[in-house]
Amino acid sequence: MFRGSIVALITPFRNGGIDERAFQDFVEWQIAEGTHGLVPVGTTGESTTLSHEEHRRVIQLCVEVSRGRVPVIAGTGSNSTEEAISLTRFAKEAGATAALVVTPYYNKPTQEGLYAHYKAIHDAVDLPIVIYNIPGRSVVDMSVATMARLAKLPNIVGVKDATGDLVRPLRTRIEIGPDFCQLSGEDATATAFLAQGGVGCISVTANVAPGLCARMQDAWARGDLAEMARVRDLLMPLHHALFVETSPGPVKYAASLLGKCAEDMRLPMVPPTQATRDVVRAALVKTGLLT
């Protein structure tokens, strides 16, 4: 259903509010550069500091600008099941292709609680759901067994795997089968994830290098391993630079250097230090994205 380079979109801010024009232009640029899909209001989009009204507005803008040219997988997760249902219902009404639903954070549900959470969303809204498993932020790790149970539900179509465990996609593929869409949530290991059964990456780096990220994924898809490796190696310093500090600080700064938006964030997120800025700028230059 989904493949390739799918960008985890930043949310531009200006003067305390969402910079809608910058966001619209950014989505257009992503599509023009060859990005295969869009994820608004995920972790990188600072969804946790958006109001519900703002969250819905960003989804709506993304769907309107993309006009069906690429899939829109809207972030609709919450640690409240009812809230996740409400956001997912809005995403469907807005015309999103699917929903990206993060595992509930902070309240640490059991595996049975995770199953019940996703089943409730699945049963309430007729929209494809991609599970977002990111234990480093949510402090809960969905097991392969739980995911296999959920995969029996017709609208649970895949996972964004940000576990960092490169054995996981192989185990998941063996347990669930090749039709379950596995997308990497880690840029630095995206190509290794492909070799283990993945079909793409929901990428932070694609915010500032959409053409290169798409080219790398396309090279894999057509079996051009030499080109894939060349682009992978070119991107590696940038992958590192964008996570020297907590994302999305570095990637927003990088986007500001490219003239795509201001680097503004909302507290408790703060702009990166000068040392991080220097690393990010150097990586953009080395990758050929900045002179």
Swiss-Prot record:
Annotated active site: 132, 160
Q: Where is this site: Part of a proton relay during catalysis?
A: 43, 106
Output the SUPFAM superfamilies linked to this UniProt entry.
Aldolase
Task: Identify the CDD domains for this entry.
Answer: DHDPS
Q: PROSITE patterns recorded for this chain?
A: DHDPS_1 (PS00665), DHDPS_2 (PS00666)
Q: Which Gene3D superfamilies match?
A: Aldolase class I
Q: Per its UniProt record, what InterPro entries does this chain match?
A: Aldolase_TIM (IPR013785), DapA (IPR005263), DapA-like (IPR002220), Schiff_base-form_aldolases_AS (IPR020625), Schiff_base-form_aldolases_CS (IPR020624)
Record: residues binding pyruvate = 44, 202
User: What reaction is this protein's catalytic activity?
Assistant: L-aspartate 4-semialdehyde + pyruvate = (2S,4S)-4-hydroxy-2,3,4,5-tetrahydrodipicolinate + H2O + H(+)
Q: Keyword Amino-acid biosynthesis: yes or no?
A: yes
UniProt EC number: 4.3.3.7
Q: Name one GO biological process term.
A: lysine biosynthetic process via diaminopimelate
| Main EC class the enzyme belongs to | lyase
Q: What compartments host this protein?
A: Cytoplasm
Main localization, broad class = cytoplasm
Keyword Cytoplasm applies: yes
Q: In which pathway does it act?
A: Amino-acid biosynthesis; L-lysine biosynthesis via DAP pathway; (S)-tetrahydrodipicolinate from L-aspartate: step 3/4
MF-aspect GO terms: 4-hydroxy-tetrahydrodipicolinate synthase activity
* Keywords, alphabetical: Amino-acid biosynthesis, Cytoplasm, Diaminopimelate biosynthesis, Lyase, Lysine biosynthesis, Schiff base
GO CC annotation: what is one? cytosol
Which family does this protein fall into?
A: Belongs to the DapA family.
Q: How does it assemble?
A: Homotetramer; dimer of dimers.
- Please explain the role this protein plays, according to its UniProt record: Catalyzes the condensation of (S)-aspartate-beta-semialdehyde [(S)-ASA] and pyruvate to 4-hydroxy-tetrahydrodipicolinate (HTPA).
What name does UniProt use for this protein?
4-hydroxy-tetrahydrodipicolinate synthase
Question: What is the protein's species of origin?
Answer: Rhodospirillum centenum (strain ATCC 51521 / SW)
Q: Which gene encodes it?
A: dapA
